[in-house]
């Protein structure tokens, strides 16, 4: 089971390409699709998240928004832009970002950037009958878009399972136990690869084997007590 950012895809593609694209297109997208029931539900969900947000900067932003005579779209965009800026995980935001990126991929504005060895390693795993799964903080829709729009074509058929934060927090061991049940695979037979020490800890606590993705450019560079790999092809040394 693989994380995406910092594991199969450079963090720079997400931080320097995908996030800025969603940021700049967010308000226009919401205005264009505001009559769509699904989009309105996501706006409502984001409002509920904002009202429950205990972060001081978020509360201050909400207070200012309520005092202004701005439209609902302008107000909620200020919060969503804030979440993007501080890289806060939000299910509503992730869903909206995925929809914006879909339009970007379909228009040809975006093309996924994966590590050079990623596709070859994934294909080799598939050929050896390993079950491949994704667990990322990005929405499942966004995950599939990333693997569908690569320079080498659609790679989504390589994966059997897709999981995002709607399954559970990636830093909580219960999430990994639930994923094991969903895949119908004993937890001790799952190997999880991530660039996050906290995620590796949570997965290991659930009973999974873990590998820390130690790539140049990743925010975290200390695997602590976890075994680390510097390229995805290196994980074959740890497979049963």
Swiss-Prot record:
Pathway: Amino-acid biosynthesis; L-methionine biosynthesis via salvage pathway; L-methionine from S-methyl-5-thio-alpha-D-ribose 1-phosphate: step 3/6; Amino-acid biosynthesis; L-methionine biosynthesis via salvage pathway; L-methionine from S-methyl-5-thio-alpha-D-ribose 1-phosphate: step 4/6. SUPFAM superfamilies: HAD-like. It catalyses: 5-methylsulfanyl-2,3-dioxopentyl phosphate + H2O = 1,2-dihydroxy-5-(methylsulfanyl)pent-1-en-3-one + phosphate. CDD domains: HAD_EP (cd01629). The keyword Coiled coil does not apply. Coiled coil: none annotated. Monomer. Bifunctional enzyme that catalyzes the enolization of 2,3-diketo-5-methylthiopentyl-1-phosphate (DK-MTP-1-P) into the intermediate 2-hydroxy-3-keto-5-methylthiopentenyl-1-phosphate (HK-MTPenyl-1-P), which is then dephosphorylated to form the acireductone 1,2-dihydroxy-3-keto-5-methylthiopentene (DHK-MTPene). PANTHER family: ENOLASE-PHOSPHATASE E1. This is Enolase-phosphatase E1. It comes from Prochlorococcus marinus (strain MIT 9303). The lineage of its organism: Bacteria, Bacillati, Cyanobacteriota, Cyanophyceae, Synechococcales.
């Amino acid at each position: 089971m693989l994380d995406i950012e910092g594991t199969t895809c450079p963090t720079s593609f997400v931080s320097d390409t995908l996030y800025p694209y969603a940021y700049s297109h967010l308000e226009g997208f919401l205005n264009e699709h505001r009559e769509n029931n699904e989009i309105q539900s996501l706006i409502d969900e984001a409002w509920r998240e904002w009202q429950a947000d205990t972060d001081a900067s978020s509360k201050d932003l909400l207070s200012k928004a309520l005092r202004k005579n701005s439209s609902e779209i302008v107000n909620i965009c200020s919060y969503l832009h804030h979440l993007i800026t501080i890289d806060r995980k939000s299910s509503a935001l992730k869903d909206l970002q995925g929809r914006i990126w879909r339009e970007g991929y379909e228009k040809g504005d975006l093309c996924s950037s994966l590590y050079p060895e990623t596709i070859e390693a994934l294909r080799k795993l598939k050929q050896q009958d390993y079950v491949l799964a994704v667990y990322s903080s990005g929405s499942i829709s966004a995950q599939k878009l990333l693997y569908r729009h690569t320079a080498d074509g659609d790679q989504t058929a390589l994966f059997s399972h897709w999981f995002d934060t709607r399954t559970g927090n990636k830093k909580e061991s219960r999430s990994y136990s639930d994923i094991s049940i969903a895949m119908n695979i004993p937890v001790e037979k799952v190997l999880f690869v991530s660039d996050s020490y906290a995620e590796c800890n949570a997965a290991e606590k659930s009973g999974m084997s873990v590998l820390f993705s130690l790539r140049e450019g990743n925010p975290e560079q200390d695997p602590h007590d976890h075994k680390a790999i510097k390229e995805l092809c290196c994980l074959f040394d740890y497979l049963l």
